[in-house]
Amino acid sequence: MLASLIGGIFGTKNERELKRMRKIVEQINALEPTISALSDADLSAKTPEFKQRYNNGESLDKLLPEAFAVCREAAKRVMGMRHYDVQLIGGITLHEGKIAEMRTGEGKTLMGTLACYLNALSGEGVHVITVNDYLAQRDAELNRPLFEFLGLSIGTIYSMQEPAEKAAAYLADITYGTNNEFGFDYLRDNMVFSLAEKKQRGLHYAIIDEVDSILIDEARTPLIISGQSEDSSHLYTAINTIPPKLRPQKEEKVADGGHFWIDEKQRSVEMTEIGYETVEQELIQMGLLAEGESLYSATNLNLVHHVSAAIRAHVLFQRDVHYIIHDGEVVIVDEHTGRTMPGRRWSEGLHQAVEAKEGLAIQPENQTLATTTFQNYFRPYKKLSGMTGTADTEAAEMKEIYGLDVVIIPTHRPMIRNDQNDLIYLNRNGKYNAIIQEIMNIRQQGVAPILIGTATIEASEILSSKLKQAGIHHEVLNAKQHEREADIIAQAGSPNAVTIATNMAGRGTDIILGGNWKAKLAKLENPTPEDEARLKAQWEQDHEDVLQAGGLHIIGSERHESRRIDNQLRGRAGRQGDPGVSRFYLSLEDDLMRIFAGDRVVAMMRAMGLKEDEAIEHKMVSRSIENAQRKVEARNFDIRKNLLKYDDVNNEQRKIIYSQRDEILAENTLQEYVEEMHREVMQAMIANFIPPESIHDQWDVEGLENALRIDLGIELPVQEWLEQDRRLDEEGLVERISDEVIARYRQRRAQMGDESAAMLERHFVLNSLDRHWKDHLAAMDYLRQGIHLRGYAQKNPEQEYKKESFNLFVNMLGVIKTDVVTDLVTDLSRVHIPTPEELAEMEAQQQQQAEAMKLSFEHDDVDGLTGEVTASQEALNESATEQQTFPVPESRNAPCPCGSGLKYKQCHGKI
């Protein structure tokens, strides 16, 4: 109430932003006559002039009016398109690092050229990020003539690209590509063995197309580079026989002999006591569990992992809803777009369990070698912006997570689409029959095209079957027909066209009323001017007929969990002031209604005695549905926020490791760095046998001599030194042993020569760093999976995760140092001196291995069975405590316990 009153007096924040930007638009428009009078050569020459002015200290904000005017004039001449004023507002929004919400068909692609041009003047590169390769290639080729006319280079990145071509694409002024490829290149760049092999040149400025899809829908999908782990396919096959023998418990707190309880809101499964006992007996009969042993003993946690995955695969994942079978493989279906996602695999053994369930060949599980999330990939950009047709419903999340404001850009022409109220039916069959009847009614009234949005492949195929029975020609666009996606969407606005699309497959391609005559022309082998004129004339007639019939009719067969996805479907109609109609058809059996809408609504509708073919249209029901969607959106936001809290911990460690890697690659020699490692490792080793501040009687000198001989291959007469010099204390001993070890290292290093020694040092340091970082990522995965159980002990899981992960990280740093020193000392003393050619070959082999690593996306959308990793995690934590070599202060900014006077993060907290 108060907010609306204040908004009425002062205007909303969005209105104030638009008012400010319109003043800048007036400046741009005032320059148009002057810029239009320039010759092509003079117009192109403006780009080097702007670059020079920028290098002389003029800001991009100051250059904006003139640069936008130049870009608009160039677009008029090269592309035959002039930016509208609302597109100029959108361009300003993007330049200022905000999200521009612009309705479908209003020209987001053209709008993006303005901010691209202005920010490319800095010479630091602009990344334009899209959701798929098709859109990246399309937009790059569409805008290439404009940017090349203005003297800017343009590149496109894609998977399996030649390294030289990809490096050139990143060096271009403007680089197009998918979010996946940009993210994977970031990870690959941090696995290279020389700086010359890096492709990306820094994260300066990014424009994300369909920003809501990438930053919201994809936020929970980590990017992972992985290698295969041990094969356990036989276990998946054996345990796959257990879930069919189990039955669900009907109510969570009412024991009825069920073996597990399904929480559909949380999308998780929890076993009951009877379930545990039954599974244990089955495993005993299979010979996988010893008689009398507990399933949850520390030695059997691998079985828990497999049982958990098998039950989830059978209970929570349905074929043609969550995945399809294609060429003998399980292919995940994106719940937000309905597109298949080849190459992506569910994590924690779930994908293998689904393969076992479907009787397919089971692919080995993967071990993570490098990982990040889109949240943590995009946040380091100096400036980030985005454009979409639907972001306002997620504005709070965009602001809180990414610091991005959403500006709603007004339409060029008024929006006249007729959004009708939802119709709610008793069951799905009644709903589907009503949809078919509505399609027949529309067909009888005129030639209006119809787009039917479904939530699942299954629903699209049911409707397709009913349309066939009714004799209605139609096209189906779902995960099984994705190859024809662009063609189907291009003609979905043709007269009498009926198109079924799963969620918003085809997003990014406008549906033009009357069809797309240019797409038809492109299909002809040798089109003549007569063909072009004929197709264009036919389109003009079809376009007018469709307008007279009321434009595109949108029929939603189900409400999505997110209002944003529903708005995307509605947004396909009513583009650029065209007419259109939209309506959703729902049933009490829809997942959203059944799980979230509330018993009161369902009870009321059943009490009304509705028949299958009768519908209800009531404000209370519509409000209840919207409230249900808000609840789901809030829950998903909390999940993403929680994921970010944990991944922020990983991200800080990742940044330290990657920064250290860059330093190692940049140094010509690591001698000083390695010698400091020697001293730290010697200090830690000696402390194990000669405790700090202890008396001589407590010293284990013999053990120290044995450790030096066995671990480092060095014979040192420590006992003899002590007998010769009674004043030799612990500190002096550390210094003397370190000096001896380093002296031998220097001697051997001199024999090798500086160049060979430097290459070998870099090889050992990077090899150890990468190997232990990989193991650390696996340990962090285990920690993450079981940390929620600390809540039962009245501990804060988030704080516990920070503490435990820090201990693991510090332990890893100590182990890396020990490994490097051990490898260098033993290899430098025992093996022949490698030639520069051999070392170069060694590095080449490492790079080939890195390039061969499997890229994958892991999905974490479904929670595991409660408590499945407790014991293994406790064992892991104990192991970390036992192996820790350096004291750990509570804060990384605290003074280092070694007494150096440096902060811990700059001393022993640094590799």
Curated annotation (Swiss-Prot):
GO biological process terms, semicolon-separated: intracellular protein transmembrane transport; protein import; protein targeting; protein transport by the Sec complex
Positions of Zn(2+) binding: 896, 898, 907-908
Keyword Cell inner membrane listed: yes
EC nos: 7.4.2.8
Entry membrane topology: Peripheral membrane protein
Required cofactor(s): Zn(2+)
GO MF term set: ATP binding; metal ion binding; protein-exporting ATPase activity
Catalytic activity, reaction form: ATP + H2O + cellular proteinSide 1 = ADP + phosphate + cellular proteinSide 2
Cofactor details (free text): May bind 1 zinc ion per subunit.
Protein's name according to its UniProt entry: Protein translocase subunit SecA
